């Protein structure tokens, strides 16, 4: 179940059993904060993994920057036409 649907489901349960509107608001707020904190904890590991990939791509970035784009720009429409015919 997606986190958004889980939050909505919990909000529906809170609406049915709540005594007042303020209780419902506080319950929804607590659940959303909990989900956000869980997502942040999960994302920490992903950001660390991506940093390694960026370092691995450094040689390719250097080669890509050395390309003389002004000399290649006139050939782009020709390459697109040839690719479209195949």
Curated annotation (Swiss-Prot):
Transmembrane segments: none annotated. Expressed in entodermal epithelium along the body column. One of its GO terms (cellular component) is extracellular region. Its main location: secreted. Residues 1-18 form the signal peptide. The modification Alanine amide is found at residue 83. Residues 19-57 form a propeptide. Disulfide bonds: none annotated. It is found in: Secreted; Target cell membrane. It comes from the Eukaryota. Keywords: Amidation, Antibiotic, Antimicrobial, Immunity, Innate immunity, Membrane, Secreted, Signal, Target cell membrane, Target membrane. Antimicrobial peptide with a broad-spectrum antimicrobial activity. Keeps its antibacterial activity under a wide range of salt concentrations that mimic physiological conditions of human blood, which is surprising, since Hydra is an obligate freshwater animal with nearly no salt tolerance. Does not affect red blood cells. Belongs to the arminin family. This is Arminin 7246.
């Amino acid at each position: 179940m997606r986190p958004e649907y889980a939050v909505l489901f919990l909000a529906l349960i809170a609406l049915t059993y709540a005594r007042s509107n303020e209780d419902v608001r506080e319950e929804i707020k607590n659940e959303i904060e909990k989900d956000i904190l869980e997502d942040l904890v999960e994302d920490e590991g992903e950001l660390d993994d991506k940093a390694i990939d960026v370092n691995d791509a450094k040689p390719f970035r250097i080669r890509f920057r050395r390309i003389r784009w002004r000399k290649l720009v006139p050939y782009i429409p020709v390459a697109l036409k040839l690719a479209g015919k195949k």
